[in-house]
């Protein structure tokens, strides 16, 4: 049985990307698309959804790094 090549769409431009070791930027098609995605995460345009409250904003929660 011959190996089937798996292809995935680039998350940024939707170009088809072969899922092989030689695809350096997978799942992205290029360094450009990889950096665009990184920029979106850094600018907080993307986020992982969560049902929990943001504990970092709770003044009653200590991280142990407060200066006294």
UniProtKB/Swiss-Prot annotation:
Transmembrane segments: none annotated. Pfam families: YacG. Zn(2+) binds at residues 10, 13, 29, 33. One of its GO terms (molecular function) is DNA topoisomerase type II (double strand cut, ATP-hydrolyzing) inhibitor activity. Its cofactor is Zn(2+). GO terms for biological process: regulation of DNA-templated transcription. Binds 1 zinc ion. Keywords: Metal-binding, Zinc. Inhibits all the catalytic activities of DNA gyrase by preventing its interaction with DNA. Acts by binding directly to the C-terminal domain of GyrB, which probably disrupts DNA binding by the gyrase. Interacts with GyrB. Belongs to the DNA gyrase inhibitor YacG family. This is DNA gyrase inhibitor YacG. It comes from Haemophilus influenzae (strain 86-028NP). The lineage of its organism: Bacteria, Pseudomonadati, Pseudomonadota, Gammaproteobacteria, Pasteurellales.
